[in-house]
Amino acid sequence: MTRIHPTAIVEPGAQIDESVEIGPYAIVGPHVTIGARTTIGSHSVIEGHTTLGEDNRIGHYASVGGRPQDMKYKDEPTKLVIGNRNTIREFTTIHTGTVQDVGVTTLGDDNWIMAYVHIGHDCRVGNNVILSSNAQMAGHVEIGDFAIIGGMSGVHQFVRIGAHSMLGGASALVQDIPPFVIAAGNKAEPHGINVEGLRRRGFSADAISALRSAYRVLYKNGLSLEEAKVQLRELAEAGGDGDAPVTALVEFIDASQRGIIR
């Protein structure tokens, strides 16, 4: 049976699973769908065309599904889609998409979103991502699986953050971080491969060694980006555990529109 506090407001039209719990003074809008076993903290607002999957935990005073902070927005019925098993802590803001992009902001599964985080319109957050307190994502940011964003960091619009990468606290990021790379600073600069994170996630010693070699090619050998990509492609065909991650690195660089941190 759904447990809705008597002071909460659930507007007609909202689709709420019977196992959902909604705390005091929370507000759920008419176009919201909330999946099984999700809990909504007190004073939170879930609005817009927002879909929450199963087993999510929304902290107190969170604002989920609000209008995008984009002056071009004209009340189009854009969406926010959130997967399963996400923790979204107090005072976080997550906005719906815009028609200038694909119209949907997405958050995958098993993400840990700490207090006061902002996820702007049209962002695409993968799975198992950690966004530390006060990390701020502008619009259209893409974050790959298992990435970690340090607290008090700011990420420019349209920036891409690769899978298994890490951005240090209080950083300002204006270009893409390739997968597996650690970056920090204002403006953010590369500081090596995320070796400890890769070990924790089961990457082999050979794969990590190949990524370290790729990092040296990309950042330490004095090569232009085009020269480095030639050597990276050769490294990706070495015939070992490192082929797949190095290939992913090259493909990410090839797809970059803003350029990568250098």
UniProtKB/Swiss-Prot annotation:
EC number of this enzyme: 2.3.1.129
Keyword Manganese attached: no
Domain of life: Bacteria
One Pfam family here: Hexapep
SUPFAM superfamilies (UniProt xref): Trimeric LpxA-like enzymes
Any GO molecular function: acyl-[acyl-carrier-protein]-UDP-N-acetylglucosamine O-acyltransferase activity
Pathway membership: Glycolipid biosynthesis; lipid IV(A) biosynthesis; lipid IV(A) from (3R)-3-hydroxytetradecanoyl-[acyl-carrier-protein] and UDP-N-acetyl-alpha-D-glucosamine: step 1/6
InterPro entries given in the database record: Acetyltransf_C, Acetyltransf_C_sf, Hexapep, Lipid_A_LpxA, Trimer_LpxA-like_sf
GO biological process, alphabetically ordered: lipid A biosynthetic process
Subcellular localization: Cytoplasm
Gene3D superfamilies, A to Z: Hexapeptide repeat proteins, Udp N-acetylglucosamine O-acyltransferase, C-terminal domain
Catalysed reactions, as listed in the record: a (3R)-hydroxyacyl-[ACP] + UDP-N-acetyl-alpha-D-glucosamine = a UDP-3-O-[(3R)-3-hydroxyacyl]-N-acetyl-alpha-D-glucosamine + holo-[ACP]
CDD domains named in the record: LbH_UDP-GlcNAc_AT
Subunit details: Homotrimer.
UniProt family annotation: Belongs to the transferase hexapeptide repeat family. LpxA subfamily.
HAMAP family the record matches: LpxA
The name this protein goes by in its record: Acyl-[acyl-carrier-protein]--UDP-N-acetylglucosamine O-acyltransferase
